[in-house]
Amino acid sequence: MKIRNSLKSLRGRHRDNQLVRRKGRVYVINKTQKRFKARQG
């Protein structure tokens, strides 16, 4: 999982990326390509 300051650019890298808020943190998740997983921090 990558840790990034800004997730907006990461979200656009694949069409299945989703921006999700969990427990006060923002994540990018992708069910089909797991390598696009990232957390904002």
Swiss-Prot record:
The UniProt record lists the keyword Ribosomal protein = yes
Task: Write down a Pfam family by its short name.
Answer: Ribosomal_L36
Q: Which GO terms describe its biological process?
A: translation
Organism whose genome encodes this protein:
Methylorubrum extorquens (strain PA1) (Methylobacterium extorquens)
Query: In Gene Ontology terms, what is one molecular function of this protein?
Result: structural constituent of ribosome
Q: Which keywords are on file for this protein?
A: Ribonucleoprotein, Ribosomal protein
| Listed name of the protein | Large ribosomal subunit protein bL36
What protein family does this chain belong to? Belongs to the bacterial ribosomal protein bL36 family.
